[in-house]
Amino acid sequence: MTKASVAIVGSGNISTDLLYKLQRSEWLEPRWMIGIDPESEGLARARKMGLETSAEGVDWLLSQAEKPDLVFEATSAYVHREAAPRYEAAGIRAIDLTPAAVGPAVVPPANLREHLDAPNVNMITCGGQATIPIVYAVSRVVDVAYAEIVASVASLSAGPGTRANIDEFTKTTSRGIETIGGAQRGKAIIILNPADPPMIMRDTIFCAIPEDADQAAITDSIHRVVKDIQQYVPGYRLLNEPQFDKPSVVSGGYATVTTFVEVEGAGDFLPPYAGNLDIMTAAATKVGEEIAQKLLSVKA
C-alpha cells in the first residue's frame, strides 16, 4: 500500500512517542526526524528505526531534494509560527502539536473532517484533546453558557517544551472550548502535580446548562463521544457517571453537569501515566491518517 511520507520536527518526548504510533500506521510512513540536539534520545531512536535524521533544524529539511507529504511538528509555539509559512510555501501539509494555533484547530470527535484540505491544522493542547470532546458532547444537546476544564497531569510528564507553553496552553484550550466545544465562554486550568509516584492524567469538565436540560440525552451524548475517543486512545475513560447539580449562586444561576475523566497512555515510548502526551500523539496520528487518505486518493 502506498503511504504518505512524513517528517517529524522535534526530537523530544512527544515526537518520539509519535514516531512509535506512526510506525504502526497503514497510511503514514515516517522517514525523517529533525531536531536541534545531536545527542537527543529521539534522534538516536529514529536512526535505529531507519529514519534519516538531522540536528540542523527545519532549514535542513527544506533544503532536501525530496520533501515529505506531511510534517508533524512538536517543538514550541514560537518555533512553529516561524516555520509554518515555510512549510506551506514548500507544499508540505503541517500538523501542529504546539499551541501556536496557526491553522484551524482539530479535535477528532468534533470536527475531524472539516479541515482536511487546510495546509496547517492545530492539535490544540493535551488538555484540549481530553476535555473539549466532552464539552462538545454536552453542547450538541443543550446550550452551554460556560465551560471550565481542569487538567491535572504528572509533573514528570511535562518537559521543557510543555512548561514553556503554559500560557499558550490556557489561551488555546480556552478558545477551543468555545470554538469547537460550543460553549459561549470557556476557561482552562492546568495543574502540574509533583506527586511521586506520578499520577495518571485526570480532567474535570464543568458545563453550565439550562435547568430543564435533558439529563439522559446529555449522558448518552457523553458516552458516545467517549467511545469515539477510545477508538484511538483506549486508555481514555470516565471515572464515574456525569454528575448533575441544580442552579446555584456559584454556577451563576445555571444548572451544571460535571464530568470526570482519566487518560492512561499506551506506553509506546512514554510511561502510561503520561496520558496527557499520549492523547496528543494519538489524536495527531488519527488526523494525519485522514489527511493522508484524502491526499493519496487525489494522487491516485
UniProtKB/Swiss-Prot annotation:
Q: Where are the transmembrane segments?
A: none
Q: What is this protein called?
A: Acetaldehyde dehydrogenase 1
Query: Catalytic residues?
Result: 126 (acyl-thioester intermediate)
Entry's Gene Ontology molecular function annotations = acetaldehyde dehydrogenase (acetylating) activity; NAD binding
What is catalyzed by this enzyme?
Answer: acetaldehyde + NAD(+) + CoA = acetyl-CoA + NADH + H(+)
- Classification via InterPro entries: Acetaldehyde_dehydrogenase (IPR003361), Acetylaldehyde_DH_C (IPR015426), NAD(P)-bd_dom_sf (IPR036291), Semialdehyde_DH_NAD-bd (IPR000534)
Query: Which terms are listed as keywords in the entry?
Result: Aromatic hydrocarbons catabolism, NAD, Oxidoreductase
**Which is a GO BP term held by this UniProt record?**
catabolic process
One Pfam family from the record: AcetDehyd-dimer
Q: Which domain of life is it from?
A: Bacteria
What family does the entry list? Answer: Belongs to the acetaldehyde dehydrogenase family.
> Into which EC class is this enzyme placed?
oxidoreductase
Q: Which SMART domains match?
A: Semialdhyde_dh
Question: What Enzyme Commission number does this protein have?
Answer: 1.2.1.10
